[in-house]
Each structure stands twice: as structure tokens, then as C-alpha cells.
Amino acid sequence: MFLEGRLETLDFITLISFLTYSNKTGILEISINHNEGLIFICNGEIYNVYYNRKWGKDALFEIMLYEYIDFCFIEGNYKGERRIWDSSEKIILELLKDYDERKAFELSPINI
């Protein structure tokens, strides 16, 4: 399976959900403003993430700060180091919570 395209933030969560709930194995290559990153998925579990000199969940949450993300998913065996031990479901829920909190903050009125 080979997927590529350009996503906005919430669609990024949808893509991650699709890949994990479909039990895919492979590498999701991302590009944000010419900065490259990698999300390693094995049997539907997010094993590791690298972006902007960060590894693990810190890198994944940094990716979420960007509105536009170019991606390419290449299916295949992944035998790398696992740095993320939370279930993909838990990670997706954390991403959604973080997204909702940021949107609520952006929309909240300023009190003077």
C-alpha cells in the first residue's frame, strides 16, 4: 500500500487512525515546511516518531502544531526500536484532546 498527499491537522489524526485501526505496518514520511519526519507503525501500533530532532510522543505532538502536512506512507516490514509504549488508541485520544484544547483556546474571548 502506498499513500501520499497533503493534510490539514485534523485530517492528520484521521490518517493516523486509519493506519492504526487497519493494523498497517510501515513508515509514514512527513514533510512540514521542508522539515522531514518519520512515524513508524507496526501492526497498527505507533512504535516511534522522529521530527525536528525529537523522538517519541514529543515529536508527534510537535507535528500536531502545524496546519499543513505533506505525507507519504510506505507499507512494509518495520523492525526498528520502539520508543512509544502507549496504545495507538490512547495516543489518538491524547492527540484529539490536545487539538480540541488548542482550538478552544484560539476561539476563547479575551477578557480585559
Pin down the residues of each PLM region:
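Acidic, Ser/Thr/Pro-enriched low-complexity segments and adjacent helix/loop capping patches
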Residues: 1-112
